[in-house]
Amino acid sequence: MTLTATERDLVDAASRWFDAHRAQFVDELCELLRYPSVSDESDPNPRPGAPYGPEVRRVFDHMLAKAGRDGLPTRDYTGHVMEVVYPQENVETDRDIAFVDHLDVVPADDGWTHDAFDPQA
C-alpha cells in the first residue's frame, strides 16, 4: 500500500506520540492485564450489569472510569457491551470509525511459567 505524503506525516506523528508515551502505555496495559476477567456465565442469577461474571464487570468498570477520566463519553449496555466515543466537533460526515474489542480473557492453564495475571514488562 502506498501512502500519500499527508498519510505518511500522520503515521510519523502517531509513531512519535507513541514513542513519547510508551512507558505510560505499558503501565496502563499491565494494569488492565491484571484483571482475571475470565467470562463466567455459570450463575443462573447474575448480578445486574454483570452477565459475564464479576471479574468482567470489574474490567468494564475500569475501562469506563478511564474513558471518563480522559473526557470521553461512554455508554454501558448492561454489561454486555460498552461504547466509548471520541467526539468530533465541526466535522461534516456521517461516517464513524469503530474499534471493536473484548475485555474477557481465556482461562489461564498450567502452561504459564508465572502468574498469568501478573504481567512482566
Put a short name on every predicted segment.
Residues E41-D94, D118-P119:
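A non-catalytic alpha/beta surface segment that caps or lines the substrate-entry region
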Residues M1-T2, L32-P36, Y86-V91, A116:
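Short hydrophobic/aromatic-rich motifs at helix boundaries and adjacent loops
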Residues L3-P54:
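N-terminal capping segment at the start of a domain
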Residues T93-A121:
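Active-site metal-coordination/substrate-binding segment of hydrolases
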Residues P36, M63-A67, F99:
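Buried hydrophobic positions in well-ordered alpha/beta secondary-structure cores of metabolic enzymes
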